[in-house]
Design a protein with these regions (language model features):
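N-terminal glutamine amidotransferase
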Residues: 1-186
Length: 186
């Protein structure tokens, strides 16, 4: 069982709070999938690209004393590789210890960036886009929205998914939706 919701504002501007609207719809579907919630939302394109990635799973934080050092090492490796490729990080946000949002400037091949970054053990890119942001984590919509500040997300459209794992693990990697690697905004 899962739940899916979406919204499109054809004449929306940057003042439409789709994060709050999506959270409300997905929270109403939490009985269809309480394990994890994911959002794919399209905000305003400001000319930069948004890189969302994780350096661990949420469950990893409970299982190992060494994970916190590994998270720091992975994040340092991500930063070093971005610098090596000439990616300029304009803004960094870390809604959780393991999930990160970078606003970047780069005019080269983003597939090369994605491959180089994902080659770091434990690192997974969730999305890259000029307007797409893919956010997913464990818990229902209110939990994920609170963690990531999604009730302040303005944009034009989005789709979301609540998941009850039946055949795979309960983790961020298995949560929906997925980014269409390596395509920007898909």
């Amino acid at each position: 069982m899962c739940g899916i919701a979406g919204i499109i504002h054809k004449k929306a501007g940057k003042d439409v709070n789709i994060g709050e609207q999506m959270t409300s719809m997905l929270q109403a579907l939490k009985h269809r999938g309480p394990d994890s919630t994911g959002y794919a939302m399209y905000g305003e394109d400001n000319g930069n690209q948004i890189l969302r990635f994780k350096v661990a799973e949420a469950a990893d934080l409970e299982g190992s004393y060494d994970i916190h050092a590994a998270i720091i090492d992975r994040l340092e490796a991500v930063n070093a590789r971005l610098t090596e490729l000439g990616v300029k990080v304009v803004n960094k946000e870390s809604p959780t210890e393991y999930a990160h949002r970078y606003e970047v400037k780069f005019s080269g091949d983003m597939k090369k960036v994605a491959d180089f970054v994902e080659d770091i053990e434990g690192v997974e890119i969730l999305s890259i886009g000029n307007s797409l942001e893919l956010i997913k984590d464990l818990g229902d919509a209110s939990v994920v929205s609170e963690q990531y500040g999604l009730n302040e997300f303005s944009g034009t459209h989005g789709i979301g998914h609540t998941r009850m794992a039946t055949e795979s693990d309960v983790d961020i990697r298995s949560a929906h939706p997925y980014w269409a690697y390596p395509f920007s905004d898909v």
